Amino acid sequence: MANKHKYLAKNVGLFSISSFVPKILSFVLIPIYTNCLTTAEYGVSDLLTTTVSLLLPFFTLDIQDAVMRFALDKKYEKSDVFTVALRIILIGTGLVTLGAFVASTLKIPGLENSYLIFFVLMYFTTALSNSLTMFCRGIDKVNVLVVGGILQSVIMLSANILFLVVFKWGLTGYLLANTLGSLVAVFWYFIRAKLHKYITKAVSKNVLKDMVRFSFPLIFSVTAWWINSASDRYILTWMSGIAVSGLYAVAYKIPGILSVFQSVFYQAWSISAIKEFDKDDKDGFISNMYNMMNFGMVFVCSVIIVLNIPIAKILYTNEFFEAYKFVPPLLVSVVFNAMALFIGSIFTAVKDTKTLSVSTIIGAVINTVCNFVFIYYWQAYGAAIATMLGYGVVFVMRHIMLRKYIKLHLKWWRDIFVYLALIVQLVSVYSLEKFSLLQLVFPVLILVFYLKEVKQIFIQFKGLVKR
């Protein structure tokens, strides 16, 4: 089991660098965004981004998730896997471009042609970047991803400062800077990972069929996941206005801190889950990883809730400061999302994408219904609560369905108690209505309940330092 921990720890270290550096740079940009963009402009940019994320699974057949799974499978030629993904992306981009052209001829009020151009560019660079990063993981080129992620963030930071602060191009400058960063990253992956070697003229039809059979059910899963994470922006815009939607979008920046921790571990874990899957979990590797992941997420979540208002005072300026009120439930939703994804990686390992889709769709339905009801009464805060409930349902359902493939050795009573403690902490934030040291009780309580996991993490970290 030592080698399993070593391999996972190495990847966690690499993904930490590729995730934390860009996130730090992105936080530098938040004051620039909130000073140079209006809430309405930020709302428009957010809607463009979320619309791209909605269309991606349909026009790419969500092939990106098949890329890593099949690149790690020795039964398939890596060149076939890469070429299949590339062809599907190019066909999808052609269709999106055609749709954008049709939209421009309809002269829809408020829909500028410049937005459509950026929309197509955002779609193409996102689709290509997603598949390239997944393929690099599959061929064990994680180090290339690290540098690529940092390079993308540095370009975005520099371009945003130039376009927003110096040239004062507003929303156009923001969109141009983000697109430029993504394009540079794509070129980097191609050059450093020598991906051109994996492009072939002839592709096995069996590879195409197997990849599409694997990824097709995920279209519904990813779409439902999008509903969980992004539909609230549209409903909020419709029911409360674009300015409130922009405020809500900014609120996601603080939960983004927790999302980095989730993303780092998940990126590394998704590789290990496929390589090390054992239905009996004889050495307890998967159970140990689950417990440590769960501890890390709930502990960091609790700490960020404590520091929510001080962080908001630093990051949010002017009218954006009110966004701090929506942060706590969004933080808890990140925890549920993280654990649902952890379990989802096991379903990916056994190639059961149908179960992933069913759980996510049910969660999305509940989320949507709650959005309409809660936003009506509580506006943006209602949207945050609905998101938390949606992810919570997916998490619980996947836990139940997982028993079909593996038996994890967990302390259910402890996990349930800690989740309830997070909810109590969330409620207490609004009762106190200001920063209070009483909030420190909650992270300390979590540490006490997860002492075993704290010791294991310390031992692993100590071993890494010695090496």
What feature does the model see in each segment?
Residues 1-25, 76-79, 83, 143, ...:
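N-terminal membrane topogenesis motif
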Residues 2, 408, 427-467:
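Membrane-proximal transmembrane or re-entrant/amphipathic helices at the cytosolic face
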Residues 11-26, 152, 174-189, 193, ...:
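Transmembrane helical elements of multi-pass membrane transporters/channels
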Residues 5-64, 97, 101, 152-157, ...:
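Signature of the first transmembrane helix
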Residues 10-22, 47-48, 57-104, 114, ...:
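Membrane-water interface segments that mark the loop-to-transmembrane alpha-helix transition
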Residues 1-4, 8, 117, 143, ...:
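Interhelical loop/hinge segments that connect adjacent transmembrane helices in multipass membrane
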Residues 117, 146-195, 362-366, 380-401:
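Hydrophobic alpha-helical transmembrane segments
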Residues 70-88, 247-360:
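Specific pore-lining/lateral-gate transmembrane helices of multi-pass inner-membrane transport
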